Amino acid sequence: MFCVQCEQTIRTPAGNGCSYAQGMCGKTAETSDLQDLLIAALQGLSAWAVKAREYGIINHDVDNFAPRAFFSTLTNVNFDSPRIVGYAREAIALREALKAQCLSVDANAHCDNPMADLQLVSDDLGELQRQAAEFTPNKDKAAIGENILGLRLLCLYGLKGAAAYMEHAHVLGQYDNDIYAQYHKIMAWLGTWPADMNALLECAMEIGQMNFKVMSILDAGETTKYGHPTPTQVNVKATEGKCILISGHDLKDLYNLLEQTEGTGVNVYTHGEMLPAHGYPELRKFKHLVGNYGSGWQNQQVEFARFPGPIVMTSNCIIDPTVGSYDDRIWTRSIVGWPGVSHLEGDDFGPVIAQAQQMAGFPYSEIPHLITVGFGRQTLLGAADTLIDLVSREKLRHIFLVGGCDGARGERNYFTDFATSVPDDCLILTLACGKYRFNKLEFGDIEGLPRLVDAGQCNDAYSAIILAVTLAEKLGCGVNDLPLSLVLSWFEQKAIVILLTLLSLGVKNIVTGPTAPGFFTPDLLAVLNEKFGLRSVTTVEEDMKQLLSA
């Protein structure tokens, strides 16, 4: 096992990465190794997808499957080894079908890629794990060095984050052939184990640019189906009655659950990254969507254990449900998996609803505590002139985007301390689950404009980018000249691709933490600092002083 893709990876003087019987996320060595094997199979599939496009062949089954299966290897998504192998087998079957399509056009068609003809050696998980050793990401570290390995992983993990957003967009009916062609090209190239530093740096920027387009179609999918988010108050306390908790990012799953629970007497609560759903008109119209429960994903083993109903996980992040003994009432959807946990194959939430009706639910309603969400792209753009006016009258000094992933490290208190230290004449724009570090605190307003503005999920970084570009255009300056600073927390691969997106758009002087990715070498960090001004957090006082004086 070797895995260094998330922020909580093991770090020692000898090197970074989880390489024991189990990773810090709870992923076993078996599952981790089989995920490496799956990725190799997906690289072979993408190699043939690239070849097929040369013949004008676009196989939508391949396009739909490839990012979804890649998403299953993202941190805290799928811990179920047999299902990972199932994805690998499906990848190979689709590859062979695609190969046959190519051969039907050109009998001499061939694909010059090391992964293009990969076959699984056995049905036995142990033998497959031994085969997977051929594809361990750091297998040639001694030959290529840490810097090349780090850049490879930056590209691989960044592309994995983009694949997750591609799947979210696909679920909402969004498809862009150019995006999929670019995805397959990059995925296939990474399967050649590239070792050119400049080419890898260029690839990382290409992934970032591609992801901007992915976030654009995801935004279109969400707003077309569910309307544009508008500011909405959400109760974060319990309401009396039977209940279901839904976590993750998939708004379609939430919509289906709300439709199926309507009139049943079962209330629905959002958790984690599902919180922004309350801002969408077509979701909040369901009166039994009563509130948001819990805090950051890392606290779920305590909070889920206390929740008096079933829980549905639609995407990341799931952690071991046996710790809180709620594994008999947690359900996984789509690419999510945990051994022994009930999995919903389709869109029928009937079994979950039936379980909710058999459980006690909340015995009484707590005193409401309301927070505000729903500052989506349209709302943000509608406030652009107000922001400019406040800046021109020196009522608004600075905007801080403080957001990103949450996690368990104590150092993440930095982001709470930073938010609460932001001066009263400054605004905090937030997104993703890092907001749970401070989103239930009171920040007041500036002439009626809330000082804490929740823009949505991690992918809603797109809205923040569009706002920044709009402000820069109206003020006749560059984005980097705005009174705007980005203070980002990272944990997994979606955060990595958001960072690449920002860097590829030329955004500079981003501050990130609580620690640098384990695959960032000192040399790589130095390059990113020199080129983009990217740096790690220090202390709240020092960072605040530096950002306000920039």
Swiss-Prot record:
Pfam families for this protein: Prismane
Note on cofactor: Binds 1 [2Fe-2S] cluster.
Main location: cytoplasm
Record: residues binding hybrid [4Fe-2O-2S] cluster: 249, 273, 317, 405, 433, 458, 492, 494
The keyword Metal-binding appears for this protein: yes
Molecular-function GO term, any one: 2 iron, 2 sulfur cluster binding
GO terms for biological process, alphabetical: response to hydrogen peroxide
Cysteine persulfide modifications at: 405
Key words of the record: 2Fe-2S, Cytoplasm, Iron, Iron-sulfur, Metal-binding, Oxidoreductase
GO cellular component term, pick one: cytoplasm
Location of the protein in the cell: Cytoplasm
Catalysed conversion reaction: A + NH4(+) + H2O = hydroxylamine + AH2 + H(+)
InterPro entries in the record: HCP/CODH, Hydroxylam_reduct, Prismane-like_a/b-sand, Prismane-like_sf, Prismane_a-bundle
EC number of this enzyme: 1.7.99.1
CDD domains: HCP (cd01914)
Domain of life: Bacteria
Keyword Heme: no
Family of this protein: Belongs to the HCP family.
Function: Catalyzes the reduction of hydroxylamine to form NH(3) and H(2)O.
Protein's name according to its UniProt entry: Hydroxylamine reductase
Origin species: Salmonella enteritidis PT4 (strain P125109)
Gene: hcp
